[in-house]
């Protein structure tokens, strides 16, 4: 099944010119390496939305570890295995299963809306939604 994945950074640095191309390259490099189909993505200043499908949970897990780890290391200059004083990512990766049909189409629209808002082509629109259980804990 397809999944909606959100990676949220502690810092608003993901859309900086030098980081945009790096993240796009890592996204598609990881997708190819771990056989993950990326249906849609939105790179925002402090978070990334992905609509993806993987052949197995292991592939998706490995892809997300690769992507999150490489982005954090490349942007902060952190070295793997060396303790850092801070975490680049604000929260753990958020995921939910996306059902085919209306759910899939609505998520495509939502990610597209994020892309347009990020580019400044449309005004930011407040989301009227209930917080997820994950968000209530913080």
PLM regions with names:
Residues 1-138:
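Short catalytic/metal-binding and nucleic-acid-binding patches
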């Amino acid at each position: 099944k397809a999944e909606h994945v959100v990676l949220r950074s502690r810092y608003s640095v993901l859309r900086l010119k030098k980081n945009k191309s790096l993240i796009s390259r890592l996204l598609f490099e990881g997708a190819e390496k771990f056989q993950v189909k990326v249906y849609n993505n939105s790179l925002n200043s402090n978070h990334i939305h992905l609509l993806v499908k993987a052949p197995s949970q292991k592939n998706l897990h490995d892809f997300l570890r690769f992507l999150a780890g490489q982005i954090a290391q490349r942007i902060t200059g952190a070295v793997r295995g060396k303790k850092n004083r801070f975490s680049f990512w604000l929260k753990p990766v958020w995921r939910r299963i996306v059902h085919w049909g209306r759910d899939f189409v609505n998520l495509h629209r939502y990610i597209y809306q994020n892309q347009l808002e990020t580019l400044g082509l449309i005004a930011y629109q407040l989301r009227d939604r209930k917080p997820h259980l994950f968000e209530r804990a913080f």
